[in-house]
Amino acid sequence: MKAMILAAGLGTRLRPLTDTTPKPLLPVAGTPMIVWNLLLLKRHGIRDVVINLHHLGAMIPQALGDGSAFGMRIIYSHEPVILGTGGGIKQAEQHFHGEPVLILNGDTLFELDLGALMDFHREQQAAATLVLRRDPEAARWGLVEVTDHAEVVRITGRGRAEPLATAARMFAGIHILHPRLLRALPAGKECSILDAYVQGIQDGERVMGYDFDGFWSDVGTPERYAQVERDAAAGLLSLSARSTGH
């Protein structure tokens, strides 16, 4: 399976750090966040990665090159105008060759067995699988409603209309999708990938949720950036295992 890392964001809440460095290149434990995610992908057998670029985008290829230094192959998708999660993924669709793709955020660090996630996606014959977390403030992050059979039926209130017994989850920004879902999105326009998932649900596509309770950090604010450095120092992230390949 190929992967895509979303790395085009402006990182406005981390200014002034992001005035001169794109957020995915900010270091944690001395290594850029996006490199930790590349190493996690490699550890789970993924070697082909697409990275989208916008804000200070030239710096990311300068840092990562073509991926050969990591034993990987990196293709870049440049966005002259930022396209959001949906538009960015749709622009890169040509690189997926009609096959499912694993999507990660370049500014999120987590400990997840990606092999188990990919196995679940295949076993469920899903059009999309969203990694979900239990969170008392799920609605603040964007409420995802999932049945006891792990089927996602509504996202931010949109999706299936009939009343169903559901549990509240938040979307962790880690997902697998089949490119056919991208047909619902406009080309060359900023949009959210969640729009494609909502349309898929309404069209009867199988959109599944995968619960994940392990370490996860969206490094979006100075406070969370400082916290993830402390978490790494405390060993909550097994970064050394990624760097050695064990």
Label the predicted regions:
Residues 2-5, 27, 31-105, 114-116, ...:
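Conserved N-terminal catalytic core of the sugar/cofactor nucleotidyltransferase
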Residues 8, 54, 133-134:
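Histidine-centered beta-alpha loop that forms part of the nucleotide-sugar donor binding/catalytic region
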Residues 46, 100-102, 109, 115-122, ...:
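Catalytic-core segments of class I nucleotidyltransferases/pyrophosphorylases
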Residues 124-134:
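A short, conserved acidic/glycine-rich loop-to-beta-strand motif
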